[in-house]
């Protein structure tokens, strides 16, 4: 799972934020935890709270799904076994990172590495900023498995639970684990990046966690993962396209192979939400509205390298400029999910459900309109150093 820029949550002042009204029908009484804050002084904060995220985390809400909804997910276990697990590949049929990298046991290893590095020389620094950002996001996989295991009704209760939900989470994690491994090894061999700074960023990110605002609620959680897997599919697809344009066909193959995995995972998560719309259209459309009013925060939004408190914003700006992941992509994903789940054709909804339906169906056009206005006002971005590429300057 990866990703990036959100047109409505970036620190850029381009677009306004939408206010979220209180939604009640899907919610049980909330348990609220104090928000996590970081001082504006990074030096002071580093001394006081060295393991805190680089920016404020939202007020934490937990276990918002009413207990009676838990039975829905229990009743779906047979369905999940037949319809979800089919989107996993047996390990023996899966690709492995070594399939795409020089073989250190092979006599021609050093020559293969030289060839890889020669190809990498043709790629611009800005491309490596985006590729490193994608890799770091993939490497924070422990956080994403943790997030899935916070969801009521579907978590792995023991660490080796035999339920289809738990099997999916573990096997999905195992498949995703290859993505960060492959990109990490490629970047190490390329010689183009400061691996110690990259590794520090990974450690900071895993230590900071993520703040998806899914409230232990699988309705919100699976809507979030549906969105994220499609965003990752788009992002890796675009890094593959750019690698090919710069003449590195093997790197394009690496990124394209990861893209295919993300597409398969997207299909699985969207099927879960599709089933929820079939069983509980009212609750699901309200959850969809809530997730979109909150605005989908990207998994790596707490990214930090020990220097740049706005690292994720800067990385996202480069991804936007290169067309790797953009505000348009965000709107396109939302429009795709509205169509995939047939939200416009839902009937029999309450007044609250109809309002939620109207909101999510109108939102893609609204986002596009806001982005068009923002582009019209946009000024040329500054050039800043990125520690990942030895502090070389890249335009935002």
From Swiss-Prot:
This is Acyl-[acyl-carrier-protein] desaturase, chloroplastic. Fe cation 1 binds at residues 138, 176, 179, 262. One of its GO terms (molecular function) is metal ion binding. Fe cation 2 binds at residues 176, 229, 262, 265. Its cofactor is Fe(2+). It comes from Cucumis sativus. InterPro entries: FADS-2_CS, Fatty_acid_desaturase-2, Ferritin-like_SF, RNR-like. Belongs to the fatty acid desaturase type 2 family. Introduces a cis double bond in the acyl chain of an acyl-[acyl-carrier protein]. Homodimer.
């Amino acid at each position: 799972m990866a990703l990036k820029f959100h047109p409505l949550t970036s620190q850029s002042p381009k677009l306004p934020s939408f206010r979220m009204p209180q939604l009640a029908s899907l919610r049980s009484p909330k348990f609220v935890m104090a928000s996590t804050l970081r001082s504006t002084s990074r030096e002071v904060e580093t001394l006081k709270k060295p393991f805190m995220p680089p920016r404020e985390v939202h007020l934490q809400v937990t276990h918002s799904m009413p207990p009676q909804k838990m039975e829905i997910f229990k009743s779906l276990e047979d369905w999940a076994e037949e319809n979800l697990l089919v989107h996993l590949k047996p390990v023996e049929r899966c690709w492995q990172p070594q399939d795409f990298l020089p073989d250190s046991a092979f006599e021609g290893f050093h020559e293969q590495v030289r060839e890889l590095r020669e190809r990498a020389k043709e790629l611009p620094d800005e491309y490596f900023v985006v590729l490193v950002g994608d890799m770091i996001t993939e490497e924070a996989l422990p956080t994403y498995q943790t997030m899935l295991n916070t969801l009521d009704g579907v978590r792995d209760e023991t660490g080796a639970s035999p339920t289809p939900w738990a099997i999916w989470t573990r096997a999905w994690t195992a498949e995703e684990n290859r993505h960060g491994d492959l990109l990490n090894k490629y970047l190490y061999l390329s010689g183009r990046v400061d691996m110690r700074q990259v590794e520090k960023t990974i450690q900071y990110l895993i230590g900071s966690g993520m703040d998806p605002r899914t409230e232990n609620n699988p309705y919100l959680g699976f809507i979030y993962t549906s969105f994220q897997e499609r965003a990752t599919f788009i992002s890796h697809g675009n890094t593959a396209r750019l690698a090919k344009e710069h003449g590195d066909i093997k790197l394009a193959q690496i990124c394209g192979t990861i893209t295919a995995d993300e597409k398969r995972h997207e299909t699985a998560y969207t099927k879960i939400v599709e089933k929820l719309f079939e069983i509980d259209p009212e609750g699901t459309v309200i959850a969809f509205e809530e997730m979109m009013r909150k605005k989908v925060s990207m998994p790596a939004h707490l990214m930090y390298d020990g220097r740049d408190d706005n690292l994720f914003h800067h990385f996202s700006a480069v991804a936007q400029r290169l067309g790797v992941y953009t505000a348009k992509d965000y709107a396109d994903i939302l429009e795709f999910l509205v169509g995939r789940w047939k939200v416009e054709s839902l009937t029999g909804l309450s007044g609250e459900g109809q309002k939620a339906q109207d909101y999510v169906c109108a939102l893609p056009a609204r986002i596009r309109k806001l982005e068009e206005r923002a582009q019209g006002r946009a000024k040329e971005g500054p050039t800043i150093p990125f520690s990942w590429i030895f502090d070389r300057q890249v335009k935002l």
